Swiss-Prot record:
GO terms for molecular function: aspartic-type endopeptidase activity; DNA binding; DNA-directed DNA polymerase activity; dUTP diphosphatase activity; exoribonuclease H activity; RNA stem-loop binding; RNA-directed DNA polymerase activity; RNA-DNA hybrid ribonuclease activity. This is Gag-Pol polyprotein. The keyword Nuclease applies. Mg(2+) 1 binds at residues 652, 727-728. Mg(2+) 2 binds at residues 980, 1012, 1032, 1085. A zinc finger (Integrase-type) spans 1228-1269. It comes from Maedi visna virus (strain 1514 / clone LV1-1KS1). Its EC number is 3.4.23.-, 2.7.7.49, 2.7.7.7, 3.1.26.4.
Length: 1506
């Protein structure tokens, strides 16, 4: 074996030094190290496994290749231990080859694992460089300066692998250690000066040591200047240090001497500081002793610092820093209490003043009293202490002379936990209380210390559930280093070292956990990060003293809870869920459900980026069935509404939801199921004991609970500013620092009594403080992310654009800039991956917002000063700013332009929003500053354009562009245009008649309102600068008077009209109420109502009065061969009157030349293109040039005669003989009836009535149909319902897996059905709108389903004017009609489904069958009955309106407000809501009379008789 070993040693000569270094690495906690045999065994085994790599030299690249391959192998069960040993040994060899010195095998494995990702990148880069520069030396990663083959040099950055390796060495051995010096000297051989200094600055280490190193470098530089006077060939200090040089310049050959000098200076500085640190007089070694006073310690420290050969700035830094860090724990705590967050910057004199009493006998007694004080009573000191036994202040419960009292039975002598009469608590009601939900852990009187093995050492750690991290003062360097970590707590910000994968052992439980090494920590703490893994929990004793209020929750009436089966999950997800649920059960947050709790909600899980599983619960169905609670908090608090405070503290409540118990009777509805893989065992069912995540009432219950808990405490502390939103608490005060922190600690103790914990690492003391996305500073506030990302021109997806705009909108309270162009870019395709194109205008708009965000800072509210809100017109938006002092805004905002509102109305809307914001945030009414002049706003208010003004307002010179008031309701000098438009004789027409005699009319499609507006538009186009417009449309009249800005109008016709009007000098608009009795309006009404001869196109000419016809124009040059006929389409469409027809005739000039028009009859209703058929009777070709008159159109009167029957008495030779007189005509209809039945499957009665065949024949057709025989209707449900015209019933039914919403009209039996996605209230309300739009119902009956009885549904029914009633619960007779309809519908649907491809088509066919093809006893279908009822209602309404149409009255007119004599009687020409129109017989004028000056009388008797 010895020979074999020596032979193997010769086989790896290149690894001789590496193996020697590897043998110094310890295998475990003891002194046992790896042997040379272990290394050779590993190398030999690797060569045997990977024969393709056997011949390659053992470089670091080969080792990483082997490492990656080993990771991909899966060893057999019996070889796992050897395989792990092989991996560990290889990791040690790799570390030794890279020059690293891990202490243990475990540390080596951690280092290699950490470098895997970086190594892959390095290999890829290395291959590329080797191809370009084959002359590189072996360890090319240490050469940032690369020699080119073509001459010269180039620079490349320091490799990340090298930088990481240097960081690791500095962290493990120290910044000034020999190991770090040796590594830096090796790698920095060809680094530039700038690279050396930058790498040194970024290394982890003591700040004092870095300051000393910098001082030594400055001394070297001063020495160089003294010894080397300036000259042409002498290097300057800047050249040596690389100041003012680019990387390329510094890499050239002429700078080699400068780089070597800089490298030597750095090495000298490292050695000097290292020797200084080991010298007895080193100030960093001067530390305060426990029995030493602070003054004596400072004297020794200052003496040591003054003796150091360093500059004065470094001495000052050492004095300020070491006077705190090297002080004793007692002095540090005293300085923290007195100096607060500025303790690190305080002078030595201030620290001596703070610690003047530390070490005295009185101070020692005070510390002893604090140490003996029971835990959890920090908030009750001195006279504020209160006995929870008798309720009196001044002593504690254990000191009470009245004896302990039981809080269950009220008797003295025993505690509640020992009470024999105590019974099991029942279900809590509203207002009842219970303790915080916790796991069944052992309860102790004070936080205990337990023995934990950390790495290789046993330590006593304090169990602290308020600490998130596990903190130790020293560590054996086992595990994986993860760099520095910042810890924040009451004492300020502290920096420690983070280590992962550290061996932790508590009793028999062993885990791999994370720790933080903090040498200055006064106590070593076991945090919550490792407590749960080790199975340790802690409950403070005083947490049992107060109970959490319970909020009652329940399901909606008639609901039974969710019963949704758990869907299948993969094995991986089941394992992740099991781990989570087991932990929740152990902590007491979930429990095992009893068998009779049948509700179920599905669960699933997702994997987070950290690799851990997160449990999700699908509470959608439970949320639907649960009654809502009011929101206790309606929005986020805003920092602009906070008052400026001297001290602030931000607290975070840990596990907020999981601390509050769920109302016990409700817990049965929260059950969920853990499946068993492959059904190997029964499923395990759980229920929630606490507020679960994802349940809709968790936020409300939490808010109400915290409100009840904190109400009394807040009232007792009026001197503080208190804010809470969910689990974030804000506390601000102007008290002293110690008093402020005392109140914070008191609050922490107070809510801890209810079981709520405040994690120490999430507590923020002092400014800057981060709260709800804001960053609070002493005099201002801003957003945490205070920059917006840049955007560039080019394509961008809608999803990314929405995220950018969302970031901007969140920050609008500091930006206050509108982005109309970017918002318009978001319109169009709503697909998230659809692309938009960013242009320069969008970039400029975005950059303006980014710049504004950089410049703007928010201020705090001062309750002693008034608040002002200033509004102005921005870029298509209203921008406003809220302030108390000019230039110091509390916040700003933007209200984007609202369509169909004038500028003044938009500013008032924004003022309302501003006022509401100020009242909510500060409780004060602001003084509003409006842009423009005061008289303009008063005029707007008087005209009725705005109906609200702020309580306190004034004006300033703003940028609002007031429109000139050129649209008035008075007569202006100029022509008058009477306009009208609408549906006349079934066609849309519009036009105007001017007082100048000008007339215009045209056919056009559109609604009545659109045609009215189009008539006004045409009049505005043709009218002069000054004109009047008269319309009978109140809608159009009021629109014009509002004088809207055309930029904010949605209606395009209205926008065009306002643009034309604003370009006029002055325009008067007038309204007349009707056409009757007003000559001009009657004239325009008749004018556009006439069916006029209208043409479209240029293929016809106007004719003279004496001409017989209209000439038609040839559209283009036409060639007609001899004897041929050609059809020519001309540019003409014509609309004839009802009593006209037309013919196309030949012109005499063409007939003389042998060219004739053939046919050419145009019917009265024809509206298509006119075509002319031409025949060339010549024996040669004829050419008709373009534009030639070649035919004529002649109008003729239309004569219509009715065709009379033949007549029964007429004598003919045939007489009554022949087929057809036998009476058997119905036989021909049987095939038609069979064909129709095969399509729609009607019943026999419908076939009998529709085709006139005998009833027996129709029944034979139905009986011979196989489909109908297989799908016979079931027996009819019996029951009675309310029936009536326009009264409907509605209900859901299910066909296979599809849901159908069915409506049936109770009078006619008409059915309307739609397939829906689900039985939700939102879906039902959408379908209700469709149903109402088609049938205009009056009343509806439904059952008591959640969708039908929801509050939103009731509000919709009330809005539509539908009387909605519900049937009797659980009584099917109350819904008998719609239930019967369900059976009929599904029976017919089953017959028709095979005939259609889509289910929706089959459903529509079913409605045709039941509504149209199904005939009743009188031969009418449900559709016939429904239409007949609607027509009867219309006729009755019309008859009633005609009876009320003709009215008579007496009236009187007023002069200067005084009523005149009564006149009349006269006929009412038009009546409105508040006035009528009559014609004055004396003056022949039309008068508008208010109803108060009218007395209506019955019509004359002769009219009544008629």
């Amino acid at each position: 074996m010895a020979k074999q070993g020596s032979k193997e040693k010769k086989g790896y000569p290149e690894l001789k030094e590496v193996i020697k270094a590897t043998c110094k690495i310890r295998v475990g906690p003891g002194k046992e190290t790896l042997t040379e045999g272990n290394c050779l065994w590993a190398l030999k085994t690797i060569d045997f496994i990977f024969e393709d790599l056997k011949t390659e030299p053992w470089t670091i690249t080969k080792m990483y290749t082997v490492w990656d391959r080993l990771k991909g192998l899966t060893p057999e069960e019996t070889s796992k231990r050897e395989f792990a040993s092989l991996q560990a040994t290889l990791a040690c060899i790799m570390c030794s080859q890279m020059g690293m010195k891990p202490e243990t095998v475990q540390a080596a494995k951690g280092i290699i694992s950490m470098k895997e990702g970086l190594q892959e990148n390095k290999e890829a880069k290395g291959e590329k460089v080797e191809q370009l520069y084959p002359n590189l030396e072996k360890h090319r990663e240490v050469y940032p300066i690369v020699n080119l083959q073509a001459g010269g040099r180039s620079w490349k950055a320091v490799e990340s692998v090298v930088f990481q390796q240097l960081q690791t060495v500095a962290m493990q051995h120290g910044l000034v250690s020999e190991d770090f010096e040796r590594q830096l000297a090796y790698y920095a051989t060809t680094w530039t000066s700038k690279d050396i200094l930058e790498v040194l600055a970024m290394m982890p280490g003591n700040r004092a040591q870095k300051e000393l190193i910098q001082g030594k470098l400055n001394e070297e530089a001063e020495r160089w200047v003294r010894q080397n006077p300036p000259g042409p060939n002498v290097l300057t200090v800047d050249q040596i240090m690389g100041v003012g040089q680019t990387n390329q310049q510094a890499s050239q050959a002429n700078m080699d001497q400068a780089r070597q000098i800089c490298r030597q200076w750095v090495i000298t500085a490292l050695r000097s500081v290292r020797h200084m640190s080991h010298r007895p007089g080193n100030p960093m070694l001067v530390k305060q002793k426990n029995t030493e006073s602070y003054e004596d310690f400072i004297a020794r420290l200052l003496e040591a610092i003054d003796a150091e050969p360093v500059t004065d700035p470094i001495k000052t830094y050492l004095k300020v820093t070491l006077s705190y860090t090297n002080a004793s724990t007692d002095c540090q705590k005293q300085m923290d209490r007195t100096l607060g967050t500025r303790v690190q910057q305080a002078t030595v004199e201030e620290k001596m003043q703070a610690c003047r009493d530390v070490g005295s006998e009185g101070f020692k007694m005070q510390l002893l009293a604090q140490a003996l004080r029971p835990q959890g009573k920090a908030g009750h000191k001195g006279v504020n202490q209160k006995c929870y036994n008798c309720g009196k202040p001044g002593h504690l419960a254990r000191q009470c002379r009245q004896g302990i009292i039981c809080h269950h039975c009220g008797k003295r002598g025993h505690m509640q936990k020992d009470c024999r009469q105590k019974k099991q608590q029942g279900k809590q009601q509203e207002g009842a209380t219970c303790g915080a939900v916790r796991a069944p852990y052992v309860v102790t009187e004070a936080p205990p210390k337990i023995e934990i093995k950390v790495g290789t050492r046993w330590k006593k750690l304090l169990v602290d559930t308020g600490a998130d991290k596990t903190i130790v003062t020293s560590h054996d360097m086992s595990g994986i280093p993860k760099g520095r970590i910042i810890l924040q707590g009451i004492g300020g910000i502290i920096e420690g070292e983070k280590w992962e994968q550290v061996h932790l052992q508590y009793k028999d439980k062993i885990i791999r956990g994370t720790i933080v090494v903090l040498a200055t920590s006064p106590v070593e703490v076991l945090g919550r990060d490792n407590m749960s893994e080790l199975g340790i929990g802690l409950i403070m004793a005083n947490l049992e003293e107060k109970k959490i209020p319970i909020t009652e929750v329940r399901l909606k009436e008639g609901c039974k809870g969710p019963h949704i089966a758990q869907w299948p999950l993969t094995q991986e997800k089941l394992e992740g869920l099991k781990e989570i649920v087991d932990r929740l059960e152990k902590e007491g947050k979930v429990g095992r459900a009893p068998p009779h709790w049948t509700c179920n909600t599905p669960i699933f899980c997702i994997k987070k980026k950290s690799g851990k599983w997160r449990m999700l619960i699908d509470f959608r169905e439970l949320n639907k069935q649960t009654e809502d609670l009011a929101e206790a908090q309606l929005g986020l608090p805003h920092p602009g509404g906070l008052q400026r405070k001297k001290h602030v503290t931000i607290l975070d409540i840990g596990d907020a939801y999981f601390t509050i118990p769920l109302y016990e009777p409700y817990r049965q509805y929260t059950c969920f199921t853990m499946l068993s893989p492959n059904n190997l065992g029964p499923c395990v069912r759980y229920y929630w004991k606490v507020l679960p995540q994802g349940w809709k009432l968790s936020p409300s219950v939490y808010q109400f609970t915290m409100q009840k808990i904190l109400r009394g405490w807040i009232e007792e502390h009026p001197m503080i500013q208190f804010g809470i939103y969910m689990d974030d608490i804000y506390i601000g005060s102007d008290l002293g620092l110690e008093e402020h922190r005392g109140i914070v600690n008191e609050l922490a103790s107070y809510i801890a009594q209810y079981g709520f914990m405040l994690p120490e690492d999430k507590r923020q003391e002092g400014y800057p403080a981060k709260w709800l996305g804001f960053e609070l500073h002493p005099e201002k506030w801003k957003f945490q992310k205070h920059t917006l990302p840049e955007i560039t021109e080019g394509p961008i997806t809608l999803n990314k654009l929405q995220k950018l705009v969302g970031d901007l909108v969140w920050r609008q309270s500091l930006i206050g800039k509108s982005i109309p162009n970017i918002l318009k870019l978001m319109e169009g395709d709503r697909a998230l991956q659809s692309e938009r194109y960013i242009e320069s205008i969008h970039v400029r708009e975005w950059e303006a917002c980014r710049q504004k965000l950089k410049e703007m800072e928010g201020n705090y509210y001062d309750e002693e000063k008034d608040i002002y809100g200033q509004l102005d017109w921005g870029n298509k938006a209203i921008e406003y700013i809220v302030f108390q002092e000019k230039g110091k805004p509390l916040w700003v905002n933007v209200v984007h332009s609202i369509k169909n509102l004038s500028q003044a109305q938009q500013i008032i809307k924004a003022a309302q929003k501003l006022t509401q914001e100020v009242i909510i945030r500060t409780g004060k009414i602001p003084w509003i500053l409006l842009p423009g002049r005061e008289e303009d706003w008063i005029l707007e208010l008087q005209m009725g354009n705005i109906n609200w003004m702020p309580s306190f307002w004034s004006c300033y010179k703003g940028s609002v562009r007031w429109k000139k008031r050129n649209v008035i309701a008075e007569v202006v000098s100029g022509p008058t245009y009477y306009t009208d438009g609408g549906k006349k004789n079934g066609r849309g027409s519009l036009g105007y008649i001017a007082s100048t005699g000008e007339k215009f009319r045209i056919y056009e499609e559109g609604t009545n309102q659109q045609l009215e507006l189009r008539a006004i538009e045409e009049a505005c186009k043709q009218g002069p600068e000054k004109m009047n417009i008269v319309t009978d449309s109140r809608y159009a009249y009021e629109f014009m008077l509002r004088n809207w800005d055309e930029e904010v109008i949605r209606n395009p016709i209205q926008a065009r009209i306002m643009e034309l009007m604003h370009n006029k000098e002055k325009i008067g608009v007038h309204w007349v109420p009707g056409h009757k009795g007003i000559p001009q309006n009657e004239e325009i009404d008749r004018y556009i109502s006439e069916i006029f001869l209208a043409k479209e196109g240029r293929g016809i000419l106007q004719k003279r009065a004496e001409d017989a016809g209209y000439d038609l124009i040839c559209p283009q040059e036409i060639s007609i061969p001899a004897g041929q006929v050609k059809r020519i389409a001309i540019d003409l469409k014509i609309n004839l009157k009802k009593d006209q027809w037309a013919m196309i005739g030949t012109k005499s000039s063409f007939a003389n030349k042998g060219v004739f028009v053939q046919g050419g009859i145009i019917d009265s209703g024809y509206q298509g293109t006119i075509q002319v058929v031409i025949y060339n009777s010549n024996n040669k070709e004829v050419v008709i040039p373009q534009g030639r008159k070649f035919a004529q159109l002649i109008l003729m009167p239309l004569i219509h005669e009715e065709l009379e029957p033949w007549g029964e008495t007429r004598k003919t030779e045939r007489g009554e003989q022949g087929f057809g007189s036998t009476g058997m005509y119905w036989i021909e209809n049987i095939p038609l009836a069979e064909e129709e039945h095969n399509k729609w499957h009607q019943d026999a009665v419908s076939l009998h009535l529709e085709f006139g065949i005998p009833r027996t024949a129709a029944e034979d057709i139905v009986q011979q149909c196989d489909v109908c025989q297989e799908n016979k209707m079931p027996s009819t449900l019996r029951g009675s319902n309310k029936r009536g015209i326009d009264h409907w019933q509605v209900d859901y039914t299910h066909y296979e897996d599809k849901i159908i919403l069915v409506w049936v009209e109770t009078n006619s039996g008409l059915i309307y059905a739609e397939r829906v996605k689900g039985e939700t209230g939102q879906e039902f309300r959408v379908q209700t709108m469709k149903w109402y739009a088609m049938f205009a119902p009056k009343s509806l009956q439904s059952d008591n389903g959640p969708a039908f009885v929801a509050e939103s549904t009731q509000l919709l029914m009330k809005y539509l004017g539908i009387e909605h009633t519900t049937g009797i619960p659980w009584n099917p007779q109350s819904q008998a009609l719609v239930e019967r309809t369900h059976q009929t519908l599904k029976n017919t649907l089953e017959k028709l489904i095979p005939m259609f491809n889509a289910f929706e088509s089959a459903l529509a066919g079913t409605l045709i069958t039941l509504n149209i093809k199904r005939k009743g006893g009188l031969g009418t279908s449900p559709m016939d009955i429904f239409i007949f009822n609607k027509e009867q209602q219309r006729i009755q309404q019309q008859s009633k309106s005609k009876q009320e149409k003709i009215r008579f009255c007496y009236y009187r007119t007023r002069k200067r407000g005084h009523p005149g004599e009564w006149q009349g009687p006269t006929q009412v020409l038009w009546g409105g809501d508040g006035a009528i129109v009559v014609k004055d017989r004396g003056t022949d004028r039309y008068l508008v009379i208010a109803n108060k000056d009218v007395k209506f009388i019955p019509p004359p008797k002769e009219i009544q008789k008629e």
